[in-house]
Amino acid sequence: MKPTLFLLAAGMGSRYGGLKQLDGLGPNGETIMDYSIYDAINAGFGKLVFVIRKDFEQDFRDKIISKYEGHIPCELVFQSIDDLPEGFTCPEGRTKPWGTNHAVMMGADVIKEPFAVINCDDFYGRDSFQVMGKFLAALPEGSKNVYSMVGFRIGNTLSESGTVSRGLCGTDANNLLTSVVERTKIQRMDGEVKYIDDNGEWTATPETTPVSMNFWGFTPDYFAYSAEFFKSFLSDPKNMENLKSEFFIPLMVDKLINDGTATCEVLDTTSKWFGVTYPEDRQSVVDKIQALVDAGEYPAK
């Protein structure tokens, strides 16, 4: 059974003005998402599911879905802040979506096969889809609790325009994920990758340290765990009082690997990540995509 690609497109870019999911960066106005879909189809993915905001539906159907319908099955699902389990209501004044794992939960009715989750506005690169596609395709029928995450080498994920935040991954001898620690202010200094540690000190980390760029591989049992744990998340008064609290994927994965329910293999990739973290990054992304097209990795049109 071919795996599904689940694209998270419900969030709006906070640091970069405009609907960055629809910003044309390729030579013919292709979006970053178009390149991800191209790479995914070549890596054996057989269906696309997009999670978006309902008010964005028409625009999205016209600009995105119309390109792919007829080539690959496509489904649209919607994330809204009022979509909560029975017994819970959205706190007054909350406008922020409930986070990436809440977005993932929206796919439960349409995804019955192994699937990968990606951000729409990150350029992950061909190799990352190949390693994830291979992992998901090799899972025996009916597999449960065997998850994965593409671990990008930190040196391949930096921005030339400023510092970045990344989830640094701890792994065991079998390449299974043991922890994800969010680090901020990461940049290359004096030829080394450094971040600010808990004591406010600059700390170096190897170029190959795996980091999470929100590229995950799951089996459908993940939806039931998420629905259950989301109730616990909402039952915590501090998550309801904080109007910006979010139910993130790493929070869910961390719980499942720590209580021994599931494993999550970290898949190494040589892909270089890039994205538009800052408006100043835009031109550099356009140039990098053009270079890949020139090198024959992507079609010119």
Mark where each language-model region is.
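A C-terminal functional module that forms or caps the active site or interfaces directly
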Residues: S226-A262
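A structural signal for short hydrophobic beta-strand segments in well-ordered beta-sheet cores
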Residues: L22, C169-T171, V266
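Conserved N-terminal catalytic core of the sugar/cofactor nucleotidyltransferase
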Residues: M1-A10, P27-V117, Y124-V131, A137-A138
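Catalytic beta-strand/loop signature of glycosyltransferases that borders the donor
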Residues: P210, E265-S271
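Active-site metal-binding loops of divalent metal-dependent hydrolases
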Residues: M12, D121-D122, I154
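Conserved core of the sugar-phosphate nucleotidyltransferase
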Residues: R126-W216, P220
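Phosphate- and divalent-cation-binding pockets in alpha/beta enzyme and binding domains
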Residues: D59-F60, D127, Y225, M252, ...
